[in-house]
Amino acid sequence: MTELSESTTSKFVTINEKGLSNFRIHLNDAGQGEAVIMLHGGGPGAGGWSNYYRNIGPFVAAGYRVILPDAPGFNKSDAVVMDEQRGLVNARAVKGMMDALGIDKAHLVGNSMGGAGALNFALEYPERTGKVILMGPGGLGASLFNPMPMEGIKLLFKLYAEPSLETLKQMLNVFMFDQSLITDELLQGRWANIQRNPEHLKNFILSAQKVPLSAWDVSPRLGEIKAKTLVTWGRDDRFVPLDHGLKLVANMPDAQLHVFPRCGHWAQWEHADAFNRLTLDFLANG
């Protein structure tokens, strides 16, 4: 088997969806079997490969086709200013990508912004949704216990507005529980992505000015999602509050919750081995 790397799995598709006309989506695509689409978060410099390179190998080895798209306006995908809430537009992008790749149905894995996209996809395209795995998803409105936005989201917007290596360090320090995991390689790679795509940063701010984060809230519709769902959370998440996990399992018909201790907002990276075991078991047996 060809070694999995960003370059060996990289490809582009062109989609045509509402708000995304003749739009190029970049993705990494590896393996054969049932499709698992992993949707990344919304921090500056984020992308499919950088969010999930600790997960793609075990999922491919377990017999899945793993697809890591760059969301519209991120990394190598085309630039865009959005006039609708981002979770919905990103869900349309996933649907368009599936059409282009000839995929009828897929399991969805979504972190933060990617979780919001997964929730919107499950609502808009239930017949094309397999199982759903969420990690600290956005798009769930107010918190019972925390003032919103939380500390991490404030730093995220600061980094979008005033990109600097120092602000990136500040955000990553809040991002993860164990700050020793913030290697120079991770820091420099993320910073390089930020510098490579200044248009993406400006467009994210413009989109947020047009459509505020409060518009992402799909809480009133959670009962419509019939897909089997595994909700995971970092106990120490400083971006999205843990009580949102309880909101999900209280309102979705078939959802369960797993909380990782000593874990921030990036469970699939901070606790990659445990996350891979848990989620692969859920896909096979959940």
From Swiss-Prot:
Catalysis performed (reactions): 2,6-dioxo-6-phenylhexa-3-enoate + H2O = 2-oxopent-4-enoate + benzoate + H(+)
One of the protein's GO biological processes: acylglycerol catabolic process
EC number, as in UniProt: 3.7.1.8
Keyword flag Hydrolase: yes
InterPro entries: AB_hydrolase_1, AB_hydrolase_fold, AB_hydrolase_sf, HOPD_hydrolase_BphD
GO terms, molecular function: 2,6-dioxo-6-phenylhexa-3-enoate hydrolase activity; 2-hydroxy-6-oxonona-2,4-dienedioate hydrolase activity; monoacylglycerol lipase activity
Amino acids binding substrate: 42-43, 51, 111, 180, 190, 266
Family to which this protein belongs: Belongs to the AB hydrolase superfamily. BphD family.
Alphabetical list of HAMAP family matching this protein: Biphenyl_BphD (MF_01688)
Protein's UniProt name: 2-hydroxy-6-oxo-6-phenylhexa-2,4-dienoate hydrolase
Source organism per UniProt: Burkholderia cepacia
